[in-house]
Swiss-Prot record:
Pfam families: OTCace (PF00185), OTCace_N (PF02729)
Single GO BP term: 'de novo' UMP biosynthetic process
Binding positions for L-aspartate per the UniProt entry: 82, 165, 217
Binding site for carbamoyl phosphate: 54-55, 104, 132, 135, 257-258
Record's catalysed reaction(s): carbamoyl phosphate + L-aspartate = N-carbamoyl-L-aspartate + phosphate + H(+)
Protein name, per record: Aspartate carbamoyltransferase catalytic subunit
GO cellular component term of the entry, any: cytosol
UniProt keywords, alphabetically: Pyrimidine biosynthesis, Transferase
Record note on quaternary structure: Heterododecamer (2C3:3R2) of six catalytic PyrB chains organized as two trimers (C3), and six regulatory PyrI chains organized as three dimers (R2).
This protein's encoding gene: pyrB
Function: Catalyzes the condensation of carbamoyl phosphate and aspartate to form carbamoyl aspartate and inorganic phosphate, the committed step in the de novo pyrimidine nucleotide biosynthesis pathway.
PROSITE patterns reported for this sequence: CARBAMOYLTRANSFERASE (PS00097)
NCBIfam families the UniProt entry points to: asp_carb_tr (TIGR00670), PRK00856.1 (NF002032)
GO molecular function: amino acid binding; aspartate carbamoyltransferase activity
Length: 301
């Protein structure tokens, strides 16, 4: 594994190896001193051409927990505002000796292009609606913690599937671990196809006997005006206590964030014991530590 762009071509043993490393990193994070020298001497750049809170901070913490130097690039205060291209921005960082790049962009394919521009490892931190592999990895890790295994498990993903890179990456990854993925949303927010997932406009079909439920927000910033009416969406697709009763008892709830309470998910459920949202955030640091380790000094080298 030289880069992490998506899960095309990945095998189950490769995924399991990375998640095993994440478990070791989780143990590190539970120590009184949450730091190891594994990446001492390496430099990691978080290059975010699109705004982010969770992913950027999570990666920066992950790198620092392993003693790497971190460079945080913010598009709003960079030479991009003066017309500099993505390529020239990355080549500038390359000249400064960066070893790994975590790249987020509003356009699909930018991390793939970056692998041709720089010598360092490239990690896709989310590109357009195409992929968000580390989010899917932390989702899988969290589900395995809760369920023990994903073999034969039904995972329902509900919400704005059309614009969701999280749904696409989970549809690639979770079946590798044996899960069945059902994606539900309004017809206008479903793609024509999604490899690895069964698509349905019927919320009940996705939730029925689900072992776990992942809820996605409406990505209004990527929508055309009038694509969905909020009141109608809430009435038909909000995950409520009553609708969740269709899933298996105590089926865990996940959400990649940011969450719009009482829109895609009933607020009381977000705070319930079934909600693993905060656990996802905690696990995200360990998973991203594992990714950086594999790419820079571990089995990826």
């Amino acid at each position: 594994m030289r880069h992490l762009l998506d899960f095309q071509g990945w095998t189950r043993p490769e995924v399991e190896s990375l998640l095993d490393t994440a478990r070791v990193m989780r143990e590190v994070l539970e120590r009184p001193v949450k730091k190891v020298p594994a990446l001492q001497g390496f430099t990691v750049a978080t290059v975010f051409f699109e705004p982010s809170t969770r992913t950027r901070i999570s990666f920066e913490l992950a790198a620092r927990r392993m003693s790497a130097d971190v460079v945080s690039f913010a598009a709003q205060t960079s030479s991009l505002q003066k017309g500099e291209s993505y390529k020239d921005t990355l080549l500038t960082l390359e000249a400064m000796g960066v070893d790994a790049y975590v790249i987020r962009a509003d356009s699909a394919g930018v991390p793939h292009q970056a692998t041709r521009w720089v010598k360092g490892a490239v990690i896709n931190g989310g590109d357009g609606r195409r992929a968000h592999p580390t989010q899917a990895l932390l989702d899988a890790y969290t589900l395995l913690e809760a369920l023990g295994t994903l073999e034969g498990k039904k995972v329902a993903i509900v919400g704005d599937i059309l614009h969701s890179r999280v749904a696409r990456s989970n549809a690639e990854l979770l079946p590798l671990l044996g899960a069945q993925v059902f994606c539900a949303g309004p017809p206008s927010l479903l793609p024509q196809s999604l490899p690895g997932a069964h698509l349905t406009p019927r919320l009940e079909e996705a939730l029925e006997e689900a072992d776990a439920v992942m809820v996605l927000r409406l990505q209004k910033e990527r929508m055309e005006a009038g694509l969905v009416h909020l009141e109608d969406y809430i009435a038909r697709y909000q995950v409520t206590e009553k609708r969740l009763a269709l899933a298996k008892p105590q089926a865990p709830l996940l959400h990649p964030g940011p969450m719009n309470r009482d829109v895609e998910l009933e607020g009381t459920l977000a705070d319930s014991a079934r909600s693993l949202v905060n656990r996802q955030v905690q696990n995200g640091v360990a998973v991203r530590m594992a990714v950086l380790y594999h790419l820079l000094v571990g089995k990826g080298r």
